[in-house]
């Protein structure tokens, strides 16, 4: 797995960034209006090699890949470059491919002439808006099965005021022959697909910069005596959107990798990247402008320039919703697409051979060792705990793949650990019982007494006992540091009194990991201590609490419960340090595997259900909504991959784990609702089959945004650690 650029790509990106910071400043962008073209900037880009980046070397270009071109476009988007760069890059490659008019190509690469493209077939759309046509010498266009170069007259090059002062023009191609180019129509179509990715990259760069400007302003502007970035009404929407902006870049990368690998998803990936970035850019700039308040509406502040370009750049193609329709047809109606040459792509989402081996080992276990009767009890919650399967996994050495080698006896790479978790989820048995017990085993190993290590730890490791967590309390919820359950020294041990809420699995577990208040005279986070408490101890009461997710949790009461001091974990009042040991098991996880199964159920339901005499899967609105769910799934997986990659490779981590959890849980919930709507009223049924599965996923998704840290907590972490906003929590 890799999310890093090559050294050469880093150097190239930095070169373009420095050049554009100086030559596409906001002052230069403003000066280029109303025509929207900066000829000096354009010639400078040519000198930097930007215009020749996709032209083969034997035609005088750099011969670089599509990925390299998107790096340029990301910087161009960040600086609102004044000129039809995405269109010119595609036109230059097509002109070079045709071998026609080498003199014109030479002037294009030198920045002395502009050639652009018409995005729609002029045989069926003879009149259309063309980006860059107000300053271009010629337009490359498709006319049915032919590709032609149409020279523009002075009368065509008529600058026209438009939404964002970009150099577009409305061209009537009726009756214009144009010079034939030796290019197949499929090659031209591939150029349009390339344009979609280039403009997507530009929009992603624009989106990130608009959020950066908004965050910087929110960190210096004060209202009511506080920086406005401390208000969650400001910081939380920005946290949502940085996930969408980052996701836009990753969708572009996925599409390029899919093209390079020949994936059947490649065409749909292009459409989804273009749709997503068009929508996300509009959302990002709108929220960024809102952050500036009334000042954002004035022309004195640069944010309005981002707002206008975010809409203008993609709309030259048409309604972005059509791109989602296109993705739906490519995913579910067999529509194919001509795709451009990708070139080298450094990004890789494969986990490697050791991870593949771990997956095969777990697959073999579930195939040979798990009976149908055992499998029938599987469930995403604690209710799916099957003691016999748990014990067999322990005997096979597969129960706790996330534990470090010094405890487990066999060191696994982080990627193999990830693959194991994914494989369990694939088989429906990534059970909370094992995950929580794994965490408790690690804490005992690190902080437990000799007695705990001798008596409790072996039982956990051998699959003979499981543990639950006693963190939350009725009055504190996610604020674990507000715990009031007391542990009072008594003789050579402790007396525990209090209540814990959402002690899931306490009815099944032998032990509970307790966070207790041991000191009320210090800061609340400093007066906590960790204990292991046997749930069969006298004074412990477990009372069920049922949720509408088909899941049981518990409220547990501790009345004069006595344990020896040897069952304490770590130092007295050192509970926070003890709890931090569990961070070694942080996987930056999300809900991608559940989302994938939910999408599969949605597709299956749409194949079964008919509306107006036609299967739902054949209807455009159904295809588009399934495609939107697929987009959210792909992004959830990509954001999670990045979170896991930075952990494995020890890279800078800008709250990537919280981003993965928050984004995936929120989209899991919205898509679960939408798929129920799409398949209604059949989706009301709990008959065995895909609609029953959609019901279950809808119930499951309700809690996804709550447990493991609420979305609100994660949004605050993202705002602070990724966007640099002031701390919003006490």
Predicted features and spans:
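A structural signal for short hydrophobic beta-strand segments in well-ordered beta-sheet cores
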Residues: 485-488
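Glycine-rich beta->alpha junctions and the first turn(s) of the following alpha-helix
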Residues: 2-12, 50, 77-78, 158-246, ...
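Glycine-rich phosphate/cofactor-binding loops in nucleotide/flavin-utilizing enzymes
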Residues: 2, 16, 71, 90, ...
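Amphipathic, small/basic residue-rich leader segments at the start of a protein or domain
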Residues: 1-82, 326-434, 455, 459, ...
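A short, Trp-centered hydrophobic/proline-enriched beta-strand micro-motif
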Residues: 110-123, 141-142, 463-471
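N-terminal glycine-rich flavin-associated loop
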Residues: 83-99, 432-451, 477
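A short core secondary-structure module
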Residues: 118, 125-162, 168, 497-541
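C-terminal helix-coil-helix/basic helical segment that borders enzyme active sites and/or dimer interfaces
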Residues: 25-36, 215, 223-226, 242-276, ...
């Amino acid at each position: 797995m890799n999310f890093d650029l090559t050294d050469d790509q880093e150097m190239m990106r930095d070169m373009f960034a420095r050049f554009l910071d100086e030559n596409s400043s906001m002052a230069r962008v403003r000066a280029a209006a109303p025509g929207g073209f900066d000829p000096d900037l354009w010639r400078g880009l040519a000198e930097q090699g930007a215009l020749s980046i996709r032209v083969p070397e034997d035609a005088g270009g750099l011969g670089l890949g599509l990925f390299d071109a998107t790096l340029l476009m990301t910087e161009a988007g960040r600086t609102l470059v004044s000129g039809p760069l995405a269109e010119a890059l595609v036109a230059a490659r097509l002109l070079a491919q045709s071998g026609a008019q080498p003199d014109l190509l030479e002037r294009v690469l030198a920045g002395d002439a502009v050639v652009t493209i018409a995005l729609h077939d002029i045989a069926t759309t003879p009149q259309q808006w063309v980006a860059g046509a107000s300053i271009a010498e010629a337009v490359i266009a498709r006319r049915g099965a032919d590709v032609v170069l149409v020279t523009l007259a002075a009368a065509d090059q008529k600058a026209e005021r438009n939404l964002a002062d970009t150099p577009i023009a409305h061209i009537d191609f009726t009756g214009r022959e144009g010079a034939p180019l030796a290019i197949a129509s499929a090659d031209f179509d591939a150029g349009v697909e390339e344009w979609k990715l280039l403009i997507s990259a530009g929009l992603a760069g624009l989106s990130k910069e608009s959020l950066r400007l908004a965050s910087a302003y929110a960190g210096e502007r004060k209202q009511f005596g506080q920086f406005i970035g401390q208000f969650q009404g400001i910081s939380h929407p920005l946290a949502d959107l940085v996930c969408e902006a980052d996701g836009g870049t990753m969708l572009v990368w996925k599409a390029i990798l899919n093209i390079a690998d020949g994936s059947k998803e490649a065409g749909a990936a292009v459409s989804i990247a273009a749709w997503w970035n068009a929508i996300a850019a509009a959302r990002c700039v709108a929220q960024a402008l809102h952050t500036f308040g009334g000042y954002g509406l004035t022309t004195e502040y640069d944010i309005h320039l981002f707002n206008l370009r975010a809409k203008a750049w993609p709309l030259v193609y048409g309604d972005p919703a059509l791109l989602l329709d296109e993705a739906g047809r490519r995913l579910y109606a067999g529509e194919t697409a001509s795709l451009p040459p990708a070139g080298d792509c450094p990004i890789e989402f494969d986990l490697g051979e050791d991870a593949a081996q771990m997956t095969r080992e777990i697959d073999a276990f579930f195939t040979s060792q798990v009976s149908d009767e055992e499998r029938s009890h599987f469930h995403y919650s604690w209710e799916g705990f099957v003691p016999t399967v748990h014990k067999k996994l322990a005997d096979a050495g597969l129960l706790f793949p996330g534990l470090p080698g010094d405890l487990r006896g066999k060191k696994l790479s982080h990627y193999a650990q990830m693959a194991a978790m994914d494989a369990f989820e694939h088989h429906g048995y990534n059970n909370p019982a094992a995950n929580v017990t794994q965490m408790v085993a690690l804490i005992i190993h690190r902080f437990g007494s000799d007695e705990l290590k001798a008596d409790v730890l072996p039982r956990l490791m051998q699959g003979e006992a499981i543990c639950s967590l006693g963190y939350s309390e009725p009055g504190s919820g996610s604020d674990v540091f507000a715990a009031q359950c007391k542990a009072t020294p008594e003789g050579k041990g402790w007396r525990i009194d209090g209540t814990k809420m959402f002690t899931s699995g306490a009815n099944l577990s032998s032990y509970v990991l307790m966070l207790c208040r041991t000191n009320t005279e210090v800061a609340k986070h400093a007066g906590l201590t960790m204990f292991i408490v046997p749930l069969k101890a006298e004074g412990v009461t477990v009372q069920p609490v049922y949720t509408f997710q088909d899941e049981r949790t518990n409220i547990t009461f501790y009345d004069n419960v006595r344990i020896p001091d040897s069952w304490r974990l770590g130092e007295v009042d050192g509970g926070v340090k003890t709890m931090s040991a569990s961070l070694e098991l942080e996987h930056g996880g999300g809900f991608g595997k559940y989302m994938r199964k939910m999408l599969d159920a949605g597709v299956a339901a749409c194949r079964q259900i008919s509306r107006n005499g036609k299967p739902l899967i054949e209807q455009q609105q159904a295809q588009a909504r399934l495609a939107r769910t697929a987009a959210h799934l792909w992004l959830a997986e990509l954001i999670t991959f990045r979170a896991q990659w930075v952990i494995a490779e020890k890279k800078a981590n800008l709250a990537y784990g919280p981003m993965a959890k928050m984004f995936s849980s929120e989209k899991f919930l919205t898509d679960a609702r939408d798929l129920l709507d799409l398949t209604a009223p059949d989706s009301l049924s709990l008959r065995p089959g895909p609609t029953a599965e959609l019901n279950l996923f809808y119930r499951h998704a309700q809690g996804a945004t709550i447990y493991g840290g609420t979305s609100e907590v994660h949004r605050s972490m993202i705002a602070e650690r990724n966007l640099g906003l002031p701390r919003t929590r006490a």
